Amino acid sequence: MRVFIISPQLTMKNTFYADEFNKEMVKQLRDYGVELYEINNKSIARCKLQIAEDSIIIVYNEHELEYEIFGEVQELLKKAIEKNAQIWPVAIDKKARIPIGVISDKQSYDVWEQLRCRDLDEQYIGIIAKIFARKIIARVFPTCYCEESEIFLSHRRIDGEDITAKIYDKMLVQAKELTPFRDVVNVKVGDAAQEVIDERMENSDVFIFIHTARSAESDWILKELRFALLRQIPVLWVQIDNADVNILKIKPSDQPHLKYTTEDFFDEEKLIKIVDTMLQTAFELIMDRSNQILGYVDLLEDLFGDKQEVVDKEKMIYRISVERKGYHYPQRNIEQYYQMFGRTPTLMDAQKLNMELNDTTADSIAILTNRIVSQSIRNNVVFDGIQDFYYHWNQYMAETQKGIKTMEIVISGAFPDSDEIFKQSLTDALILFAKAIISNGYELTFGAHPTFQELFYEIAKEISPQNYKEKVNMYISEWFLSNDSEKEAEYVDKFNLFKVDKKENLNQSLYEMRRRMIQRKEVKALVCLGGKVKENKKEEGIREEIELAQKMNIPVFVVGSVGGCSSEVALEYKNIGWRGLNNASLELNQKFLDGIDYFSMAQDMIKHISSDE
């Protein structure tokens, strides 16, 4: 879908604020890869020829027009109307709310009203431009972002209710199209409260975690964070009054995205800006997570090959026709449609997909996303996780064999020092690698990283509820247990626990734990992600673990795109042709260096190490 932006200079007298608005809008659209054309008096004729039915035309209103050039703009707009393109007028000033000429019946985007409801003046017009850009992005990339996104406000009532109420009320004013959820408001009298909360969590596009001092004590908060992270629903972490991050059992990232004091939320001017910042950051998180879906396009194309055809590229709808197995006599192919979503899909999406396809001969229609853990059928459409969809089709078509029980893959990782939004990429990578490893029959082995423990435990329970303990091996040095029998009992209940005797100091204890974890014949690969970069390279745990693996000829795979130490190590090995790291192809190592399709990386790695067995 193309977006055509008519320069304010062509339709307005005073363009100062319109230029500021336009500049920020264009920046946002370019940042997210929207195909756009800026129309000026030199390009207007050429652009008119390129307008198609699915185009969007942005035009700025003026209440008094005397420019000759406007006649050419009117001709362009007439052409757009003939092509059934969408025309979106923008009113910078309240006097210009009604467009002039052939589009006088169109509803304008009212910038003045957006500023008014925030009690802001034109100096803040860039904020409104970002909001308008989100509307365009929702239309251009409908499976990645939805203008009517649902926002789940996760908070502890005892010390977070007043703050959350302020946020909720202001969202209703500043983002009328969004649907925030606050349990005390949105759960009706007589409803089964937890059922409603669970349903709204499942339908959410983003969680906003209001981290107050008492949040860490709540099992409900822990449940909500687990729910979001396992379904790869983005979590915007908002820390209040420097609440202690170290006592959280599950952290969405290494550090909070935003930090405020309680008093900030009772200052009206600050509150308006806080909510806009939250909404913009939430949007960035949603888009960052949604963009990861693009990697699965190539993965499924490689899987199905000529058995797949594109139905609608922009809406990511595909049709597959695969020979049916397991019967002696001829029979028709399996016919299936699927649509891929980066955002959280809804029942309305299923209804639209059914209506658009209108094919009663298909065996099934599926909506695929990385937001789903368990398959369900709604509106006669199968809602399934992309990883599970790939895994089952791969098993069916290739009849691949799972790894045997004595085969392990070690995951090594720690949060790098980078922007908090992108630190969530490490959590995403950990989840996807863990799912791929366990689903393919390997055991997942790791050193007792406190944040990763809960993630790996929950993933193992989801995939193998009957024998999850056998799927995850956790190594820990006695240095960290300190005769804590309660903590040890918790670990034994969740994992295959291996305790390693502590040595004279912390560094020696860590080395011994890593050596015992890695240097075993059962270990078939080491995967390194993130890690802190230190002045003394010898203190970087990832480098020590790689050296231990190399001494046993264990292949090492280093993920570069999550940043941190693994990024530096990957570049170093690239410069020497990946020598000594593994015997995989240059292409696969390059994919680990700069790719973001972590599930595909994990599958390719498993294929490689399986072929070497």
Stretches found by the model and what they are:
Residues 2-28, 64, 91-170, 241-404, ...:
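C-terminal interaction surface of TIR/SEFIR-family domains
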Residues 5-8, 90, 153-156, 238, ...:
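Short hydrophobic segments within beta-strands
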Residues 9-10, 48-97, 198-246, 323-331, ...:
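Conserved beta-strand-loop-alpha-helix hinge of the TIR/SEFIR fold
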Residues 14-19, 68-71, 100-101, 163-165, ...:
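A short acidic (Asp/Glu
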Residues 17-49, 64-69, 168-198, 213-221, ...:
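Conserved BB-loop
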Residues 27, 31-32, 45-48, 54-59, ...:
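Acidic/glycine-enriched connector segments
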Residues 105-107, 197-201, 248, 252-258, ...:
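Short, hinge-like loop/turn segments at secondary-structure boundaries
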